Amino acid sequence: NDTYPAACKLALIDALGPLAESTKKLAKAFHDLADKHINDVTIGRTQLQDAVPMTYGQEFHAFATLLKSDLAAFDRVVPLLAQLNLGATAIGTGICADLRFRQSATKHLAQITGLPVTAAPDPVAAMTDMGAYVSTSAAVKNLAVHLKKAADDLRLLNSGPRCGFNDLNV
């Protein structure tokens, strides 16, 4: 009851690393496109209806901003995931475990992983709390929604050339 959740949390932190790196690269690419197209005017649309003028730079900047907010969410969940109930045993009381194990194990894990691993301040609460998993799921889902939005917008703007918008050539 303490080992599997600790392993799962560490695995999630490990999985977030490459995802965050890829997201940073994409955010930078959108920022670069925003700078390149800061003065290229297009029409903004709402519900596929023409609305008001905007620049492609503004659109690409918006994509980058959303990705940066997702990266900030990743940064917020890592410390939650790094709080481990390792050594809390069956229900969080630590019964039958050496009193030094929790601190020793988390200190060792922090050293060998380079992660900000700490012992959960209340192991009984940590045993039942799913908040770190829920927050991580929400952060990843939000990233997925933002990526889908960008992909859908780019696909639509690239539609054509004869009967679609044909605003962009990706």
Can you describe what each PLM-predicted range is?
Residues 1-170:
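Conserved, well-structured ligand/cofactor-binding cores
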